[in-house]
């Protein structure tokens, strides 16, 4: 309540990207250890909702979606909020500024955010160095995923080299990896949501991905053609330790008719439909992370009922505040104890 009645109005009075970076800056500030302890005290009654995927333990199924902490600056904080895992990035091989401003705006009536960020990134080398420094004092207690992408000016025919470079930097740092081929804000990127490209990508990444093999997931767009999705699923099912993230932002025009993508409630039904499709097409053999429009435990449970093994939040976190992930876990624990919902949590 404090967030919605006091903090959110203050933050929403600020330019969106400035407010976002301000919050991330606070999480990396020298006084953060005190803040960390304060947050942790709020999570003492956080229930355990363990999930095992790819031989990896997730303390709960609620994760932070890619795009929120693009450079891993708040990595130590996320478990304090009650997240069961975090996906940082999208990280590109070389540093890049992304698209020009304005490139982020809030749409409160729609329960949405619009962005045209275009993968602003400090680059793989700098982000990897930051993670190494953080890990010197011990790895986080939650799995850390790395979302990797291509630089804007890399020709499409050289895209695989960009993914290889990123993967090589983070191979020993990330617990799992997500290949972003679906952002609407990088020219031509969505055209890579094709069976043939994914075959070539896995052929080039698999030799680098061993001892131990790290899970490699593909993030798809909410408006992907089902025939293309079916081809992607074929490729994924032929490989080991794979998965799919459903879904990225929905292409939409923003201020001044600028091209960008919507996240939040407008994605809810599209994401659910794709999750159900993938679950059916793969007979439940492919791990799914469901993203898009999760603002309540009902939304979260719908994703899991449709077939998602894990869920991620972003826009709902912005609108509901820092207590949202922990509250989601508490509500999911309550649902788990009800006869009509318990079967969903026992599918393992």
UniProtKB/Swiss-Prot annotation:
Cofactor(s) this protein requires: FMN
Annotated catalytic residues: 183 (nucleophile)
Top-level EC class: oxidoreductase
Keywords attached to this entry: Cell membrane, Flavoprotein, FMN, Membrane, Oxidoreductase, Pyrimidine biosynthesis
Cofactor, free-text remark: Binds 1 FMN per subunit.
Membrane topology classification: Peripheral membrane protein
Residues reported to bind substrate: 70, 115-119, 180, 185, 248-249
Pathway where it operates: Pyrimidine metabolism; UMP biosynthesis via de novo pathway; orotate from (S)-dihydroorotate (quinone route): step 1/1
Predominant location category: membrane
Reactions accelerated catalytically: (S)-dihydroorotate + a quinone = orotate + a quinol
Residues reported to bind FMN: 66-70, 90, 147, 180, 219, 247, 264, 293, 314-315
GO terms under biological process: 'de novo' pyrimidine nucleobase biosynthetic process; 'de novo' UMP biosynthetic process
One Pfam family recorded for the sequence: DHO_dh
A Gene Ontology molecular function term of the record: dihydroorotate dehydrogenase (quinone) activity
One cellular component term from this protein's GO annotations in UniProt: cytoplasm
EC number: 1.3.5.2
Compartments, record wording: Cell membrane
Assembly with partners or alone: Monomer.
PANTHER family: DIHYDROOROTATE DEHYDROGENASE (QUINONE), MITOCHONDRIAL, DIHYDROOROTATE DEHYDROGENASE (QUINONE), MITOCHONDRIAL-RELATED
Its biological purpose: Catalyzes the conversion of dihydroorotate to orotate with quinone as electron acceptor.
Family: Belongs to the dihydroorotate dehydrogenase family. Type 2 subfamily.
Name this polypeptide is given: Dihydroorotate dehydrogenase (quinone)
